[in-house]
Amino acid sequence: MGYSKNIASGMFAMLLLASAVLSSNPHPLQDFCVADLDGKAVSVNGHMCKPMSEAGDDFLFSSKLAKAGNTSTPNGSAVTDLNVAEWPGTNTLGVSMNRVDFAPGGTNPPHIHPRATEIGIVMKGELLVGILGSLDSGNKLYSRVVRAGETFLIPRGLMHFQFNVGKTEASMVVFFNSQSPSVVFVPLTLFGSNPPIPKPVLTKALRVEAGVVELLKSKFAGGS
């Protein structure tokens, strides 16, 4: 009997611990916590708060997404981030945004946001939006041409891309449920990492000759 009670008590303790670990970020305990980006303290899941007397009066507003980005890039696109690093007022609030502008034929290459779900709205033009499922869904590609005023949803951690299929410029605005969603660009990560992934790993994984890997690495030298 005592042995059974000990097992039950142990399982209850483990459930409590799992609940604490898996719960979402705690709600803020103050109206505002403007990030002290210059602070020396170690930050964990957020930044230290500035004293409100030093925060100014414009931390709730930003005009950084008002201007289109320069799409004269190798991908033909430009991402303008508006996360906690650019908008300290979002600290502890669990939200951020970005704007992506596309030249005709431009792409936001396959990438992952490891810390956030994404909701986007196409503001101009038409974009092919693709979301790749995991092995659980058979690596299925979910895709659709999304036009101005239409929206799309990308679950946290799934690889996705956008491609301008129109003949004119396109743009979109996306929203994240994290103040710092981060991003992993798949081509850049594979072929432009620092230090580089060993060539035999890539040739074996991609089932190609070493020369193909060298060519791809040359395209992403310097992290571009």
Curated annotation (Swiss-Prot):
- As recorded in UniProt, its EC number(s) are 1.2.3.4
Q: Quote the catalytic activity from the record.
A: oxalate + O2 + 2 H(+) = H2O2 + 2 CO2
Superkingdom of the source species = Eukaryota
**What residues are glycosylation sites in this protein?**
70, 75
Q: Which Gene3D superfamilies match?
A: Jelly Rolls
Which Gene Ontology cellular-component terms appear in the entry? apoplast; cytoplasm
Boundaries of each Cupin type-1 domain copy?
63-214
Under the GO molecular function aspect, what terms does this record hold? manganese ion binding; oxalate oxidase activity
The top EC class, named as a word, is: oxidoreductase
InterPro entries reported for this sequence: Cupin_1 (IPR006045), Germin (IPR001929), Germin_Mn-BS (IPR019780), RmlC-like_jellyroll (IPR014710), RmlC_Cupin_sf (IPR011051)
Give the Pfam families listed for this entry.
Cupin_1
Q: What is its main location?
A: secreted
Q: Which cysteines are joined by disulfide bonds?
A: 33-49
Q: Has the keyword Cytoplasm been applied to this entry?
A: yes
Localization, per the record, is: Secreted, Extracellular space, Apoplast; Cytoplasm; Secreted, Cell wall
For the ligand (Mn(2+)), the binding residues are: 111, 113, 118, 160
Q: Which residues form the signal peptide?
A: 1-23
Q: What else is known?
A: Associated mostly with highly substituted forms of glucuronogalactoarabinoxylans.
Entry-linked PANTHER family: GERMIN-LIKE PROTEIN SUBFAMILY 3 MEMBER 3 (PTHR31238)
The task this protein performs is described as: Produces developmental and stress-related release of hydrogen peroxide in the apoplast. May play an important role in several aspects of plant growth and defense mechanisms.
Assembly, in brief, is:
Oligomer (believed to be a pentamer but probably hexamer).
Q: What is this protein called?
A: Oxalate oxidase GF-3.8
Q: Which organism is this entry from? A: Triticum aestivum (Wheat)
